[in-house]
Swiss-Prot record:
Gene source species: Danio rerio
Gene from which this protein is expressed: naxd
Name recorded for this polypeptide: ATP-dependent (S)-NAD(P)H-hydrate dehydratase
NCBIfam families named among the record's database cross-references: yjeF_cterm
Entry binding sites for (6S)-NADPHX: G136, N189, F190, M191, E192, F193, T194, R195, D258
Classification via HAMAP family: NADHX_dehydratase (MF_01965)
Annotated family: Belongs to the NnrD/CARKD family.
Xref: SUPFAM superfamilies: Ribokinase-like
Cofactor requirement: Mg(2+)
Length: 330
């Protein structure tokens, strides 16, 4: 409670495992935002010449197939632009040359559809600080099966796992793959959220109260951290709810969710590797997710200011440096 100047108590009328939820609503310039942004800043590693390459983050992106090559690129390059040192993309063979052509800064592994894909990727897990599963993954059974096994093996190593896009399709089909993993973060849009909710609760979603529905889904998934993207981003671990209503724009270009998931890969590594007092007792997943959602919205706002309705995710990625400075270094 001492983290925030204002808190609203929500009393649950339904038999949830938590009867009282503290809702923390943040928007740029509000006292709430002013209180949580320092927690994000506390987790950001300082730039110093004493470090070696890789210490500030080695992020793995699991995704990229023949149809979808842009999404894994956006996620991987966003992680780098936020401040991770290395980004690996584990994709299918036919996607690899395309993704490599987008940027020489990415390390691209054409193994996701190989017969020994899981073993090939597992070799790299000891070197990775977080894994982002889903951007450009597609829904082929073999790719989903490989992604599932990679999630399982990442969990065994305690690696933060961010799941987005078709990775969420996998979770809706097999929730146990991530259920209860306290270093897992899901980033659904409303359609993906609805699919997850109905898969877990076996009843239609009541869309009249997104916060309560998000809390219920998080609890059903073992207090997994969720980021429900929308007009305001709702972040919850089933115990606490944060809403990021920072100004963005009306432009919703494809790919900005990949910017969010990739940057979240970096923020999650920083949050979980920070001293326990850095987040003042708040769940590191919540702090990381708030940092990533705030950054994505600020990038959208700045890009829209320059490009208007022509704004694309590439324009947003170009804003990461200045948006990061504005939010976390000013």
């Amino acid at each position: 409670m001492n983290l925030l100047k204002r808190a609203t108590f929500i009393f649950s009328e339904q038999p949830l495992s938590l009867a009282i939820v503290i809702e923390r609503s943040f928007s740029l310039g509000s006292s709430g935002m002013d209180n949580v942004i320092p927690l994000v800043r506390n987790t950001i590693p300082p730039l110093t010449s004493k470090k070696h390459k890789g210490q500030d983050g080695r992020i793995g992106i699991i995704g990229g197939c023949q149809e979808y090559t842009g999404a894994p690129f956006f996620a991987a390059i966003s992680a780098l632009k936020v401040g991770a040192d290395l980004s690996h993309v584990f994709c299918t063979k036919d996607a690899a040359p395309v993704i490599k052509s987008y940027s020489p800064e990415l390390i691209v592994h054409p193994v996701l559809d190989s017969p020994n894909a899981v073993e090939e990727i597992e070799k790299w897990l000891p070197r990775l600080h977080s894994v982002v599963v889903g951007p450009g993954l597609g829904r082929e059974d073999m790719l989903l099966k490989n992604a599932k096994e990679i999630i399982e093996r990442s969990k065994l190593r305690g690696i933060p796992v961010i799941i987005d896009a078709d990775g969420l399709w996998l979770v809706a089909k097999e929730p146990s793959v991530i259920q209860g993993y306290q270093r897992g973060i899901l980033t659904p849009n409303f359609m993906e959220f609805t699919r997850l909710y109905e898969a877990m609760h076996h009843e239609p979603l009541d869309s009249s109260d997104h916060k309560r529905s998000a809390q219920q889904l998080s609890i059903a998934l073992g207090h997994l951290t969720l980021v429900l993207k929308g007009e305001e981003d709702i972040i919850t671990d089933g115990k606490n709810i944060l809403t990021c209503s920072q100004e963005g724009s009306g432009r919703r270009c494809g790919g900005q969710g990949d910017l969010l998931s990739g940057s979240l890969g970096a923020f999650a590594h920083w949050a979980f590797s920070s001293p326990s007092d850095a987040t003042k007792g708040m769940n590191p997943s919540l702090v990381a997710a708030f940092g990533a959602t705030s950054l994505t919205r600020q990038c959208n706002r700045q890009a829209f200011h320059k490009h208007g309705r022509s704004t694309t995710t590439s324009d947003m990625i170009q804003e990461i440096n200045s948006a990061f400075k504005k939010l976390f270094e000013s």
